[in-house]
């Protein structure tokens, strides 16, 4: 690493929130080239975000470190020849290990990057996953994907494994649920085979563990995984984890594990927006050989908002009903087929429930949320509640305004735009919004 950039990294780490630093700054690699400091981003998404939100801060820190002749900061997408040479120097080739028996990987070959529908809600997660699959043990290690149920975390995990195998069919990759890891360890202890257990998990090329939150409260399992994790990272083997929440929020998990889970890249997957939901429906229908009209896809996408699993379930119900009855899939037919499901969805998420949840989350009174008070401690939660009401219910802007103390629809529209702006520029705000979305969607 460039000496100058090493000093800058230390400075930025102390000044930026950990999530912002780990997500956007840590992945950058630096090459000093004459009067330039070239920062290499792993992909276009990271490049654009850093240019938009952090380039000013980076240039300021670079100037502070080298006041007399500060180099010009240039952002590019890696990797370049200089970067490759630098990495070869930093990581000399390891001695060839003896041939290993390939282990069963449990991967579902149907889950690949090619059929993962990308949208704003999962764009970063997909980009990071692809980067990991193409740079095993070097891009983001560990990669920690978190979000609610049925949003595509498991799909991405399988896609990573399948992409690694596509590039290296001899790679030893293990995918499993965290409860399987616990079960395997218990069996190993019972049969006095703990050394074989350690050998198996600590020598794979990539370990992909789903739903890591189930380690909570299991002290012996956490102890064993801690050492497995360390061994894999020391040997530059890839670790990918999924969870239903951010690492720091996992109760019953040791602090040393929480800290290590944040070493690489924690990246969130949110419930998909309407356009992504429609794209998913159209893609799934096409895969099933069904001609689904955009009108029907938009209807289903607008009414089923919680997660992708339920969205696909609704589509399967419509298709099955059409096949059983021999009727074409029209808008009226879809409404009829999903009538009870939509009624249940409407009962589960309503504006009053959103107001109550937001008030409890920010520890404010619900009456204050609906009042005319305009202090910052109330304005932000109120705007979030309005935006969530727009996203999670079928109410119009005027209807939402009425339910927020008789406000005008333009106030609701302004709130939605402000929330979108803050989601893109403020990591802490984004985390609060994602937490609330996850609570309500689950």
Curated annotation (Swiss-Prot):
Region (Domain II): 84-105
Chain intervals for the UniProt region annotation (Domain IV, binds dsDNA): 323-442
Major subcellular site: cytoplasm
Annotated Gene Ontology cellular component terms: cytoplasm; plasma membrane
Amino-acid positions noted as binding ATP in the UniProt annotation, renumbered to this chain: 150, 152-154
Localization: Cytoplasm
Source organism, top-level taxon: Bacteria
One GO term of the biological process aspect: DNA replication initiation
One Pfam family hit: Bac_DnaA_C
Location of the region described as Domain I, interacts with DnaA modulators in the Swiss-Prot/TrEMBL record: 1-84
SUPFAM superfamilies: P-loop containing nucleoside triphosphate hydrolases, TrpR-like
Cited InterPro entries: AAA+_ATPase, Chromosome_initiator_DnaA, Chromosome_initiator_DnaA-like, Chromosome_initiator_DnaA_CS, DnaA_C, DnaA_dom, DnaA_N_dom, DnaA_N_sf
Binding partners and assembly: Oligomerizes as a right-handed, spiral filament on DNA at oriC.
Domain notes: Domain I is involved in oligomerization and binding regulators, domain II is flexibile and of varying length in different bacteria, domain III forms the AAA+ region, while domain IV binds dsDNA.
Record HAMAP family: DnaA_bact (MF_00377)
Entry-linked NCBIfam families: DnaA
Family listed: Belongs to the DnaA family.
Protein name: Chromosomal replication initiator protein DnaA
Gene name of this polypeptide: dnaA
